Amino acid sequence: MIFWLMAMLLMFAATAQPKRAKADVKKEKELVGTFVPIPEQSFTMQDVLEDGTLGPKVEYNLPAFYMLETEVTNKAYNLFLNDLKAQGRTDDYEKARFRPENWSTIETVKWYQDPKSGKITCLSDTARYQYITSPTFELYPAVNVPYEGAVLFCQWLTEKVGNPEWEYALPSQLDWTWAAAGGKGDVYSMGGPFLRAADGTPYYHYLHVDDTWITRTDSGLHVVDLSNDKSVHLNMGFHIPYPAMSLRANGYGLYNMCGNVAEMVSNPNMAVGGSWLDPGYDIRIYSIKEYTQPSPQIGFRVIARKVKKEEIEGKK
């Protein structure tokens, strides 16, 4: 199920960005990748209610943080899993391990039904495991990951970097939304309302529905005809996500904030931004996907945030 929280970013004011230790940045890059700064912001948001009216204005102040420029990759997640095994943390490993069998959860999407055999396929059993283990896919986003695994990954990264003044976590929905907007108030992370450039080059990885199969009713409702196997095709023709660092970055230097894989946030069972299996309307910054199990459409990325002094004291 997908639903949307539409919001308007009305104003903002940025303040100072906390500095990072060079040793931390080096360790991060070795373990998971590069983090980019997301400045502190004060802004007002309004929900668009179900009846189309604007809800009350709410003031927010987000402290500055850093965000991983890509989704967490298979390479980074496998490093984490292998370290859990090396430490003998078998219970944590079982909680966090990939669930490649969940590729089957998208085989009910009739958009990929083979017109000759009638079979509905995405990846073969062998290919499902190759997506996890093959060097070909090591820089692709880690998917079919449990929420508990993503949380453990963040805790593991915090331990490995080892700076008590910083911690790694899943972003809140608000953190993620502001970072995805790249300092703008548009509905897509690259800015503006468009999914493709004027020459047809895609800005995002998403499920492209050919215009031929979209009609409008007398009441103005759009209807998509999925009865023909040629009516829908994936962007660039793939049946898997794309490399975590692909296409262009947004204004903050973040890749694939809309599309490719929907991303977990700190709120369990919620993923945002849409995926490679969602049509363009469902990969907006405010798109929300509910989930109850690991999914080939869902991955995650990590933020680094400064720990408050009183929190550090409390851990001693």
What are these regions (language model features)?
Residues 1-20, 179:
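Bacterial Sec-dependent N-terminal signal peptides
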